[in-house]
Amino acid sequence: MRNFIVFILFLNIAIGEDKILGNFFKDCNTSGTFIVFDGKNYASNDFQRAKQTFSPASTFKIFNALIALDNGVVRDTKEIFYHYKGEKVFLPSWKQDASLSSAIKRSQVPAFKELARKIGLKTMQEGLNKLSYGNTKISKIDTFWLDNSLQISAKNQADLLFKLSQNSLPFSKKSQEEVKEIILFKEDKIQKIYAKTGFNDNINLAWIVGFVKTENKILSFALNVDIKDIKNIKIREELLNKYLANFSNNNRIKSFY
């Protein structure tokens, strides 16, 4: 994500399937989908796959945080809700206490598992139902977004993220604004970019979802891609950049660095 090239949408997206876009996945010797939504129209390289559901992996952290905030499980994004107790964890950066703000930046899985347990099954299920988040299925409360029980499509992701950008999800405006603050990836005088990545090593699938906001335009996006080797995880950022650049080349968006 650190080398993420960002783009501005300034024209409406035409509904359609662009075969040229699809070549980017082929060029990387993999399969996947990219879909964008401007609030009215969609564009995708593969609408069929864009409607196919997969585990959201760490992209669900966006909505895990939203449900927690809206239900008062945490007061705000700065409250320390997770305390590291010396247990074995996957990454060194996870060996520390966490707030929502710090945990989402580190994609700190143990912290979000603890958050889900604090939310509880009943409240979490109510949250998923309110969102119409994928198949809304919960298996075990602290693994359901990782173990393939919860499934969501790229189109559904793009829809939800566009609603989040507008504060139009069925949650308080305050909670939605707080969540957007912690997924803000980059900003300048022209635009703000909000994004979250995810990777499911059970099915070797990587995600990038988010939205771009300018003074008078918003574009949400979702990309998922099959990753044969975790060493090639950067493919997802490369693909996203190529897709957005393609819109730029077609005078749909303007790029900047």
Q: Language model features by range: what are they?
A:
Residues N3-N12:
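Sec-dependent N-terminal signal peptides
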Residues A14-A50:
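Beta-lactamase-like hydrolase cores
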Residues E17-N23, C28, T53, R117-K122, ...:
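Structured C-terminal helix/loop/strand segments within mature extracytoplasmic catalytic/sensor domains
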Residues D46-K51, Q96-D97, K105-F112, S139-W145, ...:
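Flexible glycine/proline-enriched surface loops and loop-helix/loop-strand junctions
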Residues T53-K78, A103, Q157, F221:
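Active-site SXXK
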Residues D70-K85, F171-Q176:
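Short, well-structured active-site flanking segments
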Residues E79-P92, Q96, S102-Q108, I119-G120:
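Acidic helix-start/capping segments at beta-turn-to-alpha-helix junctions
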Residues P92, S99-L100, F112-L161:
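Mid-domain, small-residue-enriched loop/turn segments at the edges of structured enzyme/sensor domains
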